[in-house]
Amino acid sequence: MSTPRNPLLAGHWFTNELALIVAIGCVVLFTLAVDSNRAYYNRRDESVQEISRQVAMLGIFALGAAVVIISGGIDLSLGSTIATCGVACAAIVLALTPQSYAPSMWQSTGICIAAIGGSIVTGLMIGTLHTWLITSIKLPPFVATLATLVGLRSLARAFCDYVNVKVTGTGGSKININNPIFVFIRDNVWVSVVVLIAMVLVTWFVLSKTVLGRHIYALGGNEQAARLSGIRTENVKWAAYCFSSFTASIAAIFYLANSSVADPVTQARGHELNAIAAAVVGGCALQGGIGTVPGTLLGVIFLRVVVDGVSKMIKSQAETYEGLIVGAVVVAAVTLTQAKQLLSSGRQMFAGFRGSAAILALTLFSGLVALVTLGHWNALIISIVILIVLSGIKLSERQPSRV
């Protein structure tokens, strides 16, 4: 059996982590220099709390995404799983909360514990469903989780309407909750941060110090070789996908607490891509077998710092550009990780007519992004610089290498 590509165990993770730390520092310094409102200075505590909240919420289920990617799979349903688990959690709160009087703190605590348990059980059931579709029905992970990405939200919406009719007598696609424990979770950011730290430590320990962790890396590195070596790959996949859905069920609790409403239509929509992006930026290879927990955590921090920095620099409708930012960061991260392989193999990035067309497309696309964010003069300058740089790369590729 080939040796599992586990950079954490091999001790080759430092460079990637160091690069991310430097990148995070550069983004923060650039934001400090460019932001005219000086938000990091004038509203320091508020900025730290908001970034911490967003990092904790994304980081919790990004760990699940990373474990699945390391095992050689993919989970596209994390956002829908969060929404579904949030609905299950809110439905239990609504069903158990007395309508005729305000429950005591002890009653509210018991209701909250039951609701959290319901969210976790729902997540584990979804993870088990994914494993069955992948191992028994033999669906590719992409297809299996894409199906639940779409189907779970519709199911959660229908369940919302059913619960509202049964409990309140009126239908609705949202479930509003009023529980003091969830209010406490919302108002105390440290709760989500502590949960994230605990999950980071547990995930790191499992991946780096246990047999299951070695099997996850082996499965992602070469599934056929792992199976021939005696590893029960179906069980390892079940552990990976259940852990992914478990992290989503934990994240759902904080999503629900932050908004006090379970909304399966919009809650965590598209956030599964943010989790995958954070894992990839943190060093996880989409082909499997490579990835670290520290890298994933730093990928989450980097992604959220970049998004927050853009929101500070672009004063209006900054959320419009979040998807663009995430996509650009992922492409840049994957390109940088593949750069060494491209150089060593002698392959050309911009070969022939297709390369010239790609240079033109990249220049126009970059100019368009700069136009809508920075203005027409900056867009013109950026377009010219990118055109010159990419054309220089193409010309250098055409030069014969000297031995």
List the model feature ranges, each with a label.
Residues F30-V34, R44-Y101, W132-L139, A225, ...:
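Single transmembrane alpha-helix segments in multi-pass membrane proteins
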Residues Q99-L149, L298-L303:
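Alpha-helical transmembrane segments within multi-pass membrane transporters and channels
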Residues I111-S119, M125-I126, H130, R186-V261, ...:
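Helix-loop-helix "hairpin" substructures at the membrane interface of multi-pass membrane proteins
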Residues V67, A91, L96, L124-I137, ...:
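Membrane-interface helix caps of multi-pass small-molecule transporters
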Residues G127, C242, A248, S259, ...:
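Transmembrane alpha-helical segments in multi-pass inner-membrane proteins
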